[in-house]
């Protein structure tokens, strides 16, 4: 390593953990790790620390989890007292006020899970798959007050295939982000301004996004299944659809069963059909199509409605 830097790390979910480990293993001095506060989780609603919090404690690092940063003078002063060369931010979850953005000597550097300016916002991984993009990637940018608008220091592309799922792309981008931030800290590249005319946005997802509309093309629905599992999940009525693929040479009334085999369950769409590979009923284990069909007799014409199959 050319230079040992004093850093703050700011992140919360699994996506951020590889970058924290990479910075620590590279020998940088991580003065403090900022995460979201512990949240109630599980049946007992016990306060549970986030993945970055747990990883930081395992490394023996100081963990801070302020509930807010805006208008929090004590937090701003504590951040300033770290005497940072840079802060590395990866899916932290809180907006950094300008006073904090301006504190580190080299600024606050964000690991964003898209090739900016495409897919600014909260759900870039899912939206890249939903849109049918053939590649995604990570961008290291110097943060400004705008939403993912700062100068870009480095981009690393990652391919998206016709079978790529959100968990697979998430893990590939997390690894790419860890490698990219090490390179940026070592080489200190000049920033390139983003072209706002090319920007598009990835809004926060909700459960409603997972409802499948069978009047849509099968290719689009297959992308929804790949993009929106495990959360918010994809479903039709009470039936969760965990894995599926599109079949183009098929037609029928949208939302009805048009093909059944030993391990094949085809649902007609607005264009083509969706072959359900793995499904789950409420309170039941997930089943592949063959296991599901052994327990459910579904003649052709059976319709998926708000209760599942009818």
From Swiss-Prot:
Annotated Gene3D superfamilies: Formyl transferase, C-terminal domain, Formyl transferase, N-terminal domain
Entry GO MF terms: methionyl-tRNA formyltransferase activity
InterPro entries in the cross-refs: Fmt, Formyl_trans_C, Formyl_trans_C_sf, Formyl_transf_N, Formyl_transf_N_sf, Formyl_transferase-like_C_sf, GART_AS, Met-tRNA-FMT_C
PROSITE patterns referenced in this protein's UniProt entry, alphabetically: GART (PS00373)
One cellular component (GO) term of this entry: cytosol
Entry function: Attaches a formyl group to the free amino group of methionyl-tRNA(fMet). The formyl group appears to play a dual role in the initiator identity of N-formylmethionyl-tRNA by promoting its recognition by IF2 and preventing the misappropriation of this tRNA by the elongation apparatus.
Superkingdom: Bacteria
Pfam families: Formyl_trans_C, Formyl_trans_N
Enzyme Commission code(s) on record: 2.1.2.9
Similarity annotation: Belongs to the Fmt family.
Catalytic reactions of this protein: L-methionyl-tRNA(fMet) + (6R)-10-formyltetrahydrofolate = N-formyl-L-methionyl-tRNA(fMet) + (6S)-5,6,7,8-tetrahydrofolate + H(+)
Keyword annotations of the record: Protein biosynthesis, Transferase
Annotated positions binding (6S)-5,6,7,8-tetrahydrofolate: 114-117
Name of this protein: Methionyl-tRNA formyltransferase
SUPFAM superfamilies according to UniProt: FMT C-terminal domain-like, Formyltransferase
Keyword Protein biosynthesis: yes
């Amino acid at each position: 390593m050319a230079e040992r830097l004093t850093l703050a790390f700011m992140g919360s979910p699994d996506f951020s953990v590889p970058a924290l480990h990479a910075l620590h293993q590279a020998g940088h001095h991580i003065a403090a790790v900022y995460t979201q506060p512990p949240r109630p989780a599980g049946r007992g609603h016990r306060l549970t620390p986030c993945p970055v919090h747990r990883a930081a404690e395992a490394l023996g690092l100081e963990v801070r989890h302020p509930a807010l940063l805006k208008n929090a003078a004590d937090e701003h002063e504590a951040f300033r007292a770290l005497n940072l060369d840079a802060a590395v931010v990866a899916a932290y979850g809180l907006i950094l006020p300008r006073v904090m953005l301006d504190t580190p000597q080299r600024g606050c550097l964000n690991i964003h899970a898209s090739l900016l300016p495409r897919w600014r916002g909260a759900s870039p991984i899912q939206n890249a798959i939903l849109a049918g993009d053939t590649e995604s990637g990570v961008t290291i940018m110097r943060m400004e007050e705008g939403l993912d608008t700062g100068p870009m220091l480095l981009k690393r592309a990652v391919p998206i295939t016709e079978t790529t799922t959100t968990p697979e792309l998430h893990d590939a981008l997390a690894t790419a982000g860890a490698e990219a931030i090490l390179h940026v800290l070592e080489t200190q590249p000049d920033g390139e301004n983003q072209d706002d005319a090319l920007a598009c946005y990835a809004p926060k997802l909700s459960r409603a996004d997972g409802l499948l509309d069978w009047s849509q093309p099968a290719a689009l629905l297959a992308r929804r299944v790949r993009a929106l599992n495990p959360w918010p999940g994809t479903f039709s009525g009470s039936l969760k659809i965990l894995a599926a693929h599109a079949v183009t040479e098929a037609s029928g009334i949208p939302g009805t069963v048009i093909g059944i085999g030993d391990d094949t369950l085809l649902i007609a769409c607005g264009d083509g059909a969706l072959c359900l590979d793995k499904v789950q009923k409420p309170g039941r284990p997930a089943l592949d199509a063959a296991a599901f069909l052994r327990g459910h007799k579904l003649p052709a014409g059976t319709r998926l409605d708000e209760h599942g199959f009818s």
